[in-house]
A protein has these predicted regions:
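Short acidic low-complexity segments
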Residues: 1-8
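Cysteine-nucleophile active-site neighborhood
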Residues: 19-92
């Protein structure tokens, strides 16, 4: 929705994202009252929140895509470019294992579909994947969870995650 009042009334919120960090933050900022509504409903109001791909990255303090840009600042960290090498393709695209590294009600081991060129580096990492070394697959705390992978493309694993999110009472 583009309506901050709908966000304020929402039972739970999903913030998807495809594209560049700055463009997505600019898109939120261009909707009068949207960032304030998200802050009020999610951080102050405790509504369950799921950020997907760039939606997860926006939870960070800073994104470094096309310069350094402020994110929502809900989870301490920066979003940095993945470094390509002859053995490592960027973007990271395809199926990879999701490996829990800290307890979280919604994250279980499994295989998910990833498509990204930037990765979160910071606090509150709850799952990683391997792409030439550990890469953040999910971040979370309290009532917020962000996943770098795409649940909507991750077949059974993604459907199960979305079902758990719909039942989640943090």
């Amino acid at each position: 929705t583009a309506d901050p009042d709908a966000v304020l009334a929402a039972d739970r919120i999903v913030l998807p994202g495809v594209g560049a960090f700055r463009a997505c933050m600019d898109g939120l900022a261009a909707l009068p009252g949207m960032i304030d509504a998200l802050q009020a409903r999610v951080i102050k109001g405790g509504a369950p929140f799921l950020g997907v791909c760039v939606g997860m990255q926006l939870m960070a303090d800073i994104g470094e895509e096309f310069g350094a840009h402020r994110g929502l600042g809900w989870v301490r960290g920066r979003v940095r470019a993945l470094t390509p090498s002859p053995e490592l393709r960027v973007p990271h695209m395809g199926w990879n294992d999701v490996v829990p590294v800290a307890p979280h009600a919604l994250i279980q081991p499994g295989e998910a579909y990833f498509l990204h060129s930037f990765a979160f580096d910071g606090d509150e990492v709850v799952a990683t994947t391997d792409h030439g070394g550990p890469v953040t697959a999910a971040i979370g705390r309290d009532n917020v969870l962000g996943v770098q992978f795409h649940p909507e493309k991750s077949q059974r694993y993604g459907i199960a995650l979305l079902e758990r999110f719909l039942e989640w009472r943090p």
